[in-house]
Amino acid sequence: MDAARAQQIIESDQVIEVLHEGSPVWIEKVMDNNMAHVSYIHTKEEKDVPLYMLVEKELPKNFH
């Protein structure tokens, strides 16, 4: 994921599912060094991860 998209997700009114190594995360902050501060939804653990390791989960094609 790039920094611009991560920032769009933070600012969005919608809930957009983002995964880090298969685990759902909430992006807390995009940092200048191509890192993001995230919190893991199921464990509440927080850490800094590289933006390239974040994946936006796509909605099913038949989702309306």
Swiss-Prot record:
UniProt-annotated location(s): Spore core
Keyword field: Sporulation
Metal-binding as UniProt keyword: no
GO BP field: asexual sporulation; sporulation resulting in formation of a cellular spore
Zinc as UniProt keyword: no
Sequence similarity: Belongs to the SspH family.
Name by which UniProt lists this protein: Small, acid-soluble spore protein H
Gene, per the UniProt record: sspH
